[in-house]
Amino acid sequence: MKRNRLSFMNKVLLSSPAVKQPRLGCCSPLSQAHMRAARLDWGSLPHRVVLCVFQYLPLIDRARASSVCRRWNEVFHIPDLWRKFEFELNQSATSYFNSTHPDLIQQIIKKHAAHLQYVSFKVDSSTESAEAACGILSQLVNCSTQTLGLISTAKPSFMTMSKSHFVSALTVLFVNSKSLSSIKIEDTPVDDPSLSILVANNSDTLRRLKMSSCPHVSSDGILCVADHCQGLRELALNYYMLSDELLLALSNETHVNLEHLRIDVVSENPGQIEFHSIKRQSWDALIKHSPGVNVVMYFFLYEEEMETFFKEETPVTHLYFGRSVSKGILGRLSLNCPRLVELVVCANGIQVIDNELICIAEHCKNLTALGLSECEVSCTAFIEFVRLCGRKLTHLSIMEDVLIPDDVCSLDEIHTEVSKYLGRIWFPDVMPVW
């Protein structure tokens, strides 16, 4: 509704007599006086009022409105409007979103680079777009950037460009920005030396670091970050970077409490089956130091690759299985994941997981969310699971194909029973038929 009002206002401004010069001889003196008064009215609006309106306008509408009068053009260049900007770069023949115009990019670099604090680059799947993003990045030498995000909308295009070119551009920002607090550089060729430069210049300010799928970063590289960035509160990385030493560094008494630790567990090498294990003492140290930390784990492994995990107590809170997971692994969760809050299982094959699900409900007392797809659970067992969890189960997403009717309960009856225990209306999800 607000957007509609603003768009309407913009149209009024662009078509108003305030922005059209009257043609001599066509208007009466009274009309000309009225138009001059209108022009004065628009131009005399306080800066703070125009600034408030501009903050809600898309950039293209803001630029059009800035041509109304000189004062509005002055507001257009106020630094507060240029704290945050997302550069969109693509190849028009293969992308679905509009690219930031080159003239605008140059104007931002020349006039507003010093004002930029929250900068992101959204690129398509082409190497050319990634290289263009790095070209802009290398020119941000006079900015005080606090947040940096590199986003690939399709395949990780930053990984297809020259590693030296990428690292060089990133290093420029790391050296010139002394107050970086949040960095998202996932799926990029960042390496250990560039992280060392980041630490040397921003160790006191860094709070969030997301760098999953960065194959050129070693466990030693991320350990260096944890050792020196004592204010780090959020960290996202791949499992191969995780080590006992890293967890102990994050548990140091001089380190602030960690709030969010995301771990992506993927096969780094084709045919890899064995993964290193993390000692329970290391996990215990982390939880003792940061009792409220969310430990999020995404698994993209095959069943035979998961033998290492959940043999001992693991403080995971949010657990996502992107591929098929065995009954044995699900059985371990109830024994060794007492902090589990959310569980999503994308597939389990044709094995019924009644007992495993009920055991999870009995032992994982903090569970509030469950998602199941391509699994098999009897209706009776599912109702028992919901009964054990009760109303604390705030998110329940189950595909209808998962539920197997039995002698006690049918699909037509299950929503009534489940709704009763949840305290709200609930139905299983249904795959749409197109």
From Swiss-Prot:
CDD domains: FBXL21_LRR. Gene3D superfamilies: 1.20.1280.50, Ribonuclease Inhibitor (3.80.10.10). Pfam families: F-box-like. GO terms for biological process: entrainment of circadian clock by photoperiod; protein ubiquitination; rhythmic process. It is found in: Cytoplasm, Cytosol; Nucleus. Signal peptide: none annotated. Expressed in the adenohypophysis, hypothalamus (especially in the suprachiasmatic nucleus or nuclei, SCN) and pineal, all neuroendocrine structures associated with timing and homeostasis. Residues 39-85 form the F-box domain. PROSITE patterns: FBOX. GO terms for cellular component: cytosol; nucleus; SCF ubiquitin ligase complex. Pathway: Protein modification; protein ubiquitination. InterPro entries: F-box-like_dom_sf, F-box_dom, Leu-rich_rpt_Cys-con_subtyp, LRR_dom_sf. It comes from the Eukaryota. LRR repeats lie at residues 140-165, 187-213, 214-239, 242-265, 322-347, 349-374, 375-400. PANTHER family: F-BOX/TPR REPEAT PROTEIN POF3, F-BOX_LRR-REPEAT PROTEIN 21-RELATED. Substrate-recognition component of the SCF(FBXL21) E3 ubiquitin ligase complex involved in circadian rhythm function. Plays a key role in the maintenance of both the speed and the robustness of the circadian clock oscillation. The SCF(FBXL21) complex mainly acts in the cytosol and mediates ubiquitination of CRY proteins (CRY1 and CRY2), leading to CRY proteins stabilization. The SCF(FBXL21) complex counteracts the activity of the SCF(FBXL3) complex and protects CRY proteins from degradation. Part of the SCF (SKP1-CUL1-F-box) E3 ubiquitin-protein ligase complex SCF(FBXL21) composed of CUL1, SKP1, RBX1 and FBXL21. Interacts with CRY2. Interacts with CRY1. This is F-box/LRR-repeat protein 21. The gene is Fbxl21.
